[in-house]
C-alpha cells in the first residue's frame, strides 16, 4: 500500500474506473446501522462520511455498524479502525475482494483475500492494540510490487497455476496467493 499505488489510482480515475468527484451518501437503516453509497468513488471519503453518523451512534447506544457499497479499494483498513479506537471505540473492519487464494491443496483461486482489521482503544486517545491483515499469507500488492521490481518472492507467498509454491511473482500472480497460515 502507500504512495507506490498513487499512479494506478490516478490512471483509474482518468479511465473512469473510479469517480474522483463522487459524493458519498449515508443512509440510516436503524438508529445504530448505516449504509454508505460511495457512488463509484474511493472508499476513504465514504468511510469518513459514514463515521460522522457511526461514532455518535456508537457512543450513544454502545454499538453501531456501517457498511460501504459501490466503492474502490479501501486499502489499509487499520487506518480506519485506528481512527475509531483513538475515539475510544472498539473497532472491527472487514472488506470483500475478488477470488485470489486457492484453498489448501487446491489450484484455482476461489477465496478472496478479504482484509480484516481489529483495533482496541487505549487511554487518552491512544490505540492499545491494532491488527490489520489479509487472509492471504501476504498482501497481493507485495507480490505485484516484487513483479514490477523484477524481484523474486519468498517461498510460501504464492502458488503457481498448478498449485505449487513459487518464488516467481509472475507465476504467483497467474496462480494464487498462498493462504494465511498455509491453510
Q: Where in this protein do the model-derived segments appear?
A:
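Active-site cofactor/substrate anionic-group-binding motifs, chiefly glycine-
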Residues: 2-55
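A short, polar/proline- and glycine-enriched secondary-structure boundary/capping micro-motif
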Residues: 47, 140-144, 177-178
